[in-house]
Amino acid sequence: NQDCRPGWSFYEQNCYKVF
């Protein structure tokens, strides 16, 4: 499990911002 910023999701070994 990866640590992403609040409001971000982890997918395919990267974090991306969800809106």
From Swiss-Prot:
Localization per Swiss-Prot or TrEMBL: Secreted
Bridged cysteine pairs (disulfide): C4-C15
Keyword set includes Disulfide bond: yes
GO cellular component, one term: extracellular region
Residue ranges of every copy of the C-type lectin domain listed in the record: 1-19
Keyword list, A-Z: Disulfide bond, Lectin, Secreted
Disulfide bond keyword on record: yes
Principal location listed in the UniProt entry: secreted
GO molecular function: carbohydrate binding
Domain of life of the native organism: Eukaryota
Tissue: Expressed by the venom gland.
Family according to the record: Belongs to the true venom lectin family.
Name used for this protein in its record: C-type lectin domain-containing protein 2
